[in-house]
UniProtKB/Swiss-Prot annotation:
Record-linked Pfam families: ATP_bind_1
Bias kind Acidic residues: ranges: 282-293
Short sequence motif Gly-Pro-Asn (GPN)-loop: positions: 70-72
GO molecular function: GTP binding; GTPase activity
Superkingdom, natural source: Eukaryota
Example of a GO biological process term: mitotic sister chromatid cohesion
Annotated site, Stabilizes the phosphate intermediate, chain positions: N72
Organism: Aspergillus fumigatus (strain ATCC MYA-4609 / CBS 101355 / FGSC A1100 / Af293) (Neosartorya fumigata)
Function noted in UniProt: Small GTPase required for proper nuclear import of RNA polymerase II and III (RNAPII and RNAPIII). May act at an RNAP assembly step prior to nuclear import.
UniProt binding sites for GTP: G13, A14, G15, K16, S17, T18, S176, K177, M178, D179
Oligomer status and interactors: Heterodimers with gpn1 or gpn2. Binds to RNA polymerase II (RNAPII).
Name the record gives this protein: GPN-loop GTPase 3
Length: 293
């Protein structure tokens, strides 16, 4: 029996837990079953209590104290420990039916998604290649305020593409916190970010003035230098060559926005194709023999 799930990922501050809460609320409103899994060992509080919490197995605070590791090293240790104790996941997830949407709330350290092979191993165990047989989709969140700084936006886009290539699973990329940029960017301009128009970088490079000589170690000198422009151009060309990344817009305060994102997730994991037709309620049954035709 297949199961269905979504890995909610993205850099710290992108609004992952807030999106999870909005998604759970929407699912409850529409009477859909969900199972909330927290996989962030450093998490502190939630709007909805997780049904399964990695902190019951291991916490980042304990690891940093006992192993004398920093935050990043401690997080890597936590995931290594999880991979050694996968029965912690299987015992809770195996009984779930195909009616559930399993929501995995992931940590914000993007190195887990981009170049450390821990998460691909976890995905392989959870997905249809592993014993749990979960149809998985990754939802990668990027904060919409990144569009104010084009270079920062394309760096975030590059990290999203890196996660797509490394995890090798269906992906939905999301620009979160859209309510914060409505008055900053026009709709026409925002559309170029949603569809990732690499000419945005070229526009910025072409319109920039020649850098003024200054301290080569200063931030302003570095960001206006020719090397930085060449780097931006190379990043834009790489993203354009793959043509993989586009974004959905998300405002968690807007029910229709959450529903639209969920619809794309459902399509990616083929959720509705596996659902059995529901029997009508007794009060909705019609006696066609007595009905006027």
């Amino acid at each position: 029996m297949s199961k269905f799930g979504v890995l909610v990922m993205g850099p710290a501050g992108a609004g992952k837990s807030t999106f999870c809460s909005a998604l759970i609320q929407h699912l409850q409103t529409t009477r859909r079953s969900c199972f909330y899994v927290n996989l962030d060992p450093a998490a502190e509080s939630f709007n909805y209590e997780p049904d399964l919490d990695i902190r019951e197995l291991i916490t980042l605070e304990d690891v940093m104290e006992e192993m004398e590791l920093g935050p990043n090293g401690g997080l890597i240790y936590c995931f290594e420990f999880l991979l050694q104790n996968l029965d912690f996941l299987s015992q809770a997830l195996d009984p779930l039916s195909e009616e559930y949407l399993i929501i995995f709330d992931m940590p914000g350290q993007i190195e887990l998604y981009t170049h450390i092979p821990l998460l691909p191993s976890l995905v392989q165990y959870l997905s249809r290649q592993g014993p749990l047989n979960i149809n998985l989709c990754a939802a990668y969140l990027l904060e919409s305020t990144f569009v104010i700084d084009k270079a920062k936006f394309f760096a975030g886009t590059l990290s999203a593409m890196s996660a797509m290539l490394m995890l090798e699973m269906p992906h939905v990329n999301i620009l979160s916190k859209m309510d914060q940029v409505r008055d900053m960017v026009s709709r026409k301009e925002l559309k170029r970010f949603v569809n990732v128009d690499v000419n945005l970088l070229q526009d910025e490079i072409g319109g920039a003035e020649e850098p003024v000589e200054g301290d080569p170690s200063s931030k302003d000198t570095l960001l206006s230098g020719r090397s930085f422009k060449r780097l931006n151009r190379a990043v834009g060309q790489l993203i354009d060559d793959f043509s993989m990344v586009s974004f959905l817009k998300l405002d968690v305060q807007d029910e229709d926005s959450v529903a639209a994102v969920l619809s794309h997730i459902d399509d990616a994991i083929q959720f509705h194709e596996a659902q059995e037709p529901r029997e009508p309620n007794d009060e909705q049954d019609v006696d066609y023999e007595d009905a006027d035709i």
